[in-house]
């Protein structure tokens, strides 16, 4: 027996693994703790003879190698595979810890060796790694002692402290303190476990990722203090600068070695960016910024790249490569409308005037019943205004044959000189020559945040115009008569405003203040399938003299849409997903109402009938009234690919107010005043809305009307 034990002892003394083994933190959460003094491990190899705190170990001829974060014994001999019997395992170092017994058991549970196990160097290293991998300890030291029954292993552990607080550096991080506290509060007062700490740090990282802060990094802990305070360094990814580069047709940003100059001013571009220098990089915010740049219609392409800021490590520079599109357009064409008849149109438009995103438009329209010259200028966002206020102004000159004095089947009212008619009077059509202009300011109710998606919008402005009552030859004719050769004075009306003295001026001056508010909650502005829209407006005309009326015109509109799937003609509609975007099928309802208070010129009355009203009648052929109500129900559904269909019902009523219009032109022309129409239509999808052909009946009388237009009625 003694001989066998001697052999065992001899074999043990030649082993490489049982002098001293140290484990240090090799995780990113490590506090960089080592049991060995820093001066002792500044070299790859440390001779244990110079390590005083290990002098009691029976093996002093071994060197200590540092490999992969582990400190292991090596005497240069390849004998790590020799097996040794373990007689006893003792864990110490936990005794003074508040949760010491728990940590002792955790250390034992982490090991898969027990007294009586036969192990070698590799098995021992694996067990040491398991102890450290438990996350409860910042350091592990193992000593071996030769005993009468085998090798005694003494494992000295350095427990992590009781966690008291987790701090983020810097203190002004964007992540809410409450969110951090919610993650760690129930963890405070327990022993710090590096694995659990990592899991909770991952929750912080997930918050940054979900919010779009894709460049944010959490490093640490930078240190773990003895009193249990963990400090985490947060690098949120600050944007140092935003560089703009304009690309030419060749895709290059430089010309002759110099940066290419763009037409659009830098501040016009950067005001669309919520991302600014000094802000934290956010992928979602930057994506929204790019969408806003595209929405300006100033750019064909916008490319984004990120570069490092060499002067501020950890910060980034955003580089935007912009391809500007041509913003000047010359348009022209022929067309037909109920109000203008056959017309020719020519226009010149510039949507980026002076590089400030101003839109200017010169439009000339020559029609069968109307001629218009119009110039307009609009600024989509007044420079420096945080409310994103827009401005629009226009001036115009027009001559038109007013629809209020025409009827499709009951003739028209002709222009006459005075209340005395004769058979020699020519049958001249009424012509209104209008000269004027106006301006308006509009803004979303965003609370001063230009990037807030606001559903409400308000508008205020003024309009000015001078209206002359003439005939087609330009002669002043302020009166109108349906049958100018009859001499029936009861049928002669004043075309314009009639003052209290009973006169009939040949020219009116109209000055008005306008105000409106609207709310748009539609899911799609061009082809809505759900949501609602509301608008309310008022225009107050003020008198500027004897020929200038005072009255108020109010109008309200409300529409809403209900998504449905009643007809399943396309593949997308056959899907079980009711909200499938490939099946834009909906039932929409629209309600309109309006009234006028005060004395108005007849040509300022409400008109009903036409493509945007009750579709079974031509424009203004249903009524000329002082008040009105309209209602429409429309079912829209896809038919095949880009083709869609619609079934609708329209209704309108003047509420008996045609008699309240001065001169009663609607009554003279025997306009119905109320009516309904049923019909259907078909549309072809285009970027600005469907090209639509509608067929509508007039009170189911068998009289059908065909209308062609762009975009849905509402």
What is each stretch, according to the model?
Residues 2, 6-32:
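Classical Sec-dependent N-terminal signal peptides that target proteins to the secretory pathway
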Residues 2-4, 30-338, 342, 347, ...:
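Periplasmic polypeptide-binding modules associated with outer-membrane biogenesis and secretion
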Residues 97, 116, 138, 162, ...:
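Short beta-strands and strand-coil junctions in structured, solvent-facing domains, enriched
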Residues 169, 173-181, 205, 217, ...:
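Gram-negative/organellar outer-membrane beta-barrel architecture
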Residues 328-340, 657-674:
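Small/polar, glycine/serine/threonine/aspartate-rich low-complexity segments that form flexible
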Residues 348, 377, 558, 591, ...:
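Hydrophobic, well-ordered secondary-structure elements that form the walls
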Residues 475-657, 662-664:
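C-terminal outer-membrane beta-barrel translocator/porin domains of Gram-negative envelope proteins
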């Amino acid at each position: 027996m003694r001989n066998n034990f001697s052999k065992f002892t001899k074999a043990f003394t030649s082993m490489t693994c049982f002098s001293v083994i140290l484990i240090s933190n090799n995780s990113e959460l490590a506090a960089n703790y080592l049991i060995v003094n820093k001066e002792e491990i500044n070299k790859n190899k440390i001779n244990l003879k110079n390590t005083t705190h290990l002098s009691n170990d029976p093996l002093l001829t071994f060197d200590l190698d540092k490999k992969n974060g582990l400190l292991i014994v090596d005497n240069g001999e390849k004998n790590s595979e020799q097996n040794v019997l373990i007689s006893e395992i003792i864990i110490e170092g936990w005794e003074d810890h508040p949760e010491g017994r728990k940590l002792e058991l955790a250390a034992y549970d982490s090991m898969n060796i027990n007294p009586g196990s036969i192990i070698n160097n590799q098995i021992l290293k694996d067990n040491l790694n398991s102890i450290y991998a438990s996350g409860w300890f910042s350091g592990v030291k193992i000593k071996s002692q030769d005993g009468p029954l085998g090798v005694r292993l003494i494992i000295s552990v350095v427990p992590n402290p009781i966690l008291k607080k987790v701090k983020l550096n810097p203190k002004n991080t964007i992540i809410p303190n409450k969110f951090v506290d919610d993650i760690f509060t129930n963890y405070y007062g327990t022993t710090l476990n590096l694995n659990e700490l990592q899991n909770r740090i991952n929750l912080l990282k997930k918050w940054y990722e979900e919010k779009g802060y894709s460049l944010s990094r959490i490093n640490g802990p930078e240190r773990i203090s003895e009193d249990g305070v963990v400090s985490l360094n947060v690098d949120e990814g600050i944007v140092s600068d935003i560089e703009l580069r304009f690309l030419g047709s060749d895709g290059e940003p430089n010309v002759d070695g110099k940066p290419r100059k763009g037409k659009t001013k830098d501040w016009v571009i950067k005001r669309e960016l919520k991302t600014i220098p000094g802000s934290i990089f956010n992928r979602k915010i930057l994506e929204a910024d790019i969408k806003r740049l595209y929405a300006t219609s100033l750019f064909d392409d916008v490319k984004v790249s990120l570069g490092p800021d060499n002067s501020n490590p950890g910060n980034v520079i955003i580089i935007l490569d912009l391809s500007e599109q041509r913003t000047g357009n010359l348009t022209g064409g022929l067309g037909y409308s109920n109000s203008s008849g056959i017309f020719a149109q020519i226009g010149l438009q510039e949507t980026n005037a002076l590089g400030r995103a101003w839109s200017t438009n010169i439009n000339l329209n020559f029609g069968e019943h109307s001629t218009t010259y119009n110039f307009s200028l609009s600024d989509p966002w007044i420079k420096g205004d945080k409310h994103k206020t827009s401005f629009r102004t226009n001036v115009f000159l027009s001559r038109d044959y007013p629809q209020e004095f025409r009827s499709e089947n009951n003739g028209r009212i002709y222009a006459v000189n005075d209340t005395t008619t004769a058979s020699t009077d020519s049958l001249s059509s009424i012509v209104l020559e209008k000269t004027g202009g106006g301006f308006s300011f509009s803004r979303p109710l965003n609370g001063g945040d230009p990037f807030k998606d606001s559903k409400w919008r308000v508008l205020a402005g003024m309009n000015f115009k001078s209206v002359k009552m003439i005939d087609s030859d330009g002669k002043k004719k302020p009166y109108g008569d349906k049958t100018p050769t009859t001499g029936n004075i009861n049928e002669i009306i004043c075309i314009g405003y009639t003052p209290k003295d009973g006169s009939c001026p040949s020219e009116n001056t109209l000055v008005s203040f306008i105000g409106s508010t609207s709310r748009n909650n539609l899911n799609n502005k061009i082809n809505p399938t759900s949501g609602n829209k509301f608008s309310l407006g008022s225009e107050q005309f003020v008198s500027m003299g004897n020929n200038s009326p005072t009255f108020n015109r109010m109008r309200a509109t409300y529409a809403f849409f209900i998504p449905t799937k009643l007809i399943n003609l396309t593949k997308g509609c056959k899907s079980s997903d009711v909200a499938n975007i490939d099946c834009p099928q909906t039932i929409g309802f629209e309600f309109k109402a309006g009234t006028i208070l005060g004395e108005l010129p007849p040509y300022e009355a409400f008109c009903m009938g036409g493509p945007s009203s009750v579709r079974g009648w031509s424009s203004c052929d249903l009524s000329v009234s002082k008040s009105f109500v309209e209602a429409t129900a429309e079912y829209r559904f896809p038919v095949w690919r880009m083709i869609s269909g619609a079934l609708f019902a329209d209704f309108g009523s003047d509420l008996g107010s045609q008699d309240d219009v001065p001169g009663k032109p609607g009554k003279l022309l025997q306009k119905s005043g109320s009516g309904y129409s049923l019909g259907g239509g078909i549309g072809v999808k285009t970027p600005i809305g469907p090209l639509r052909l509608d067929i509508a009946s007039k009170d189911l009388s068998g009289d059908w009307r065909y209308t062609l237009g762009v975009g849905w009625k509402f």
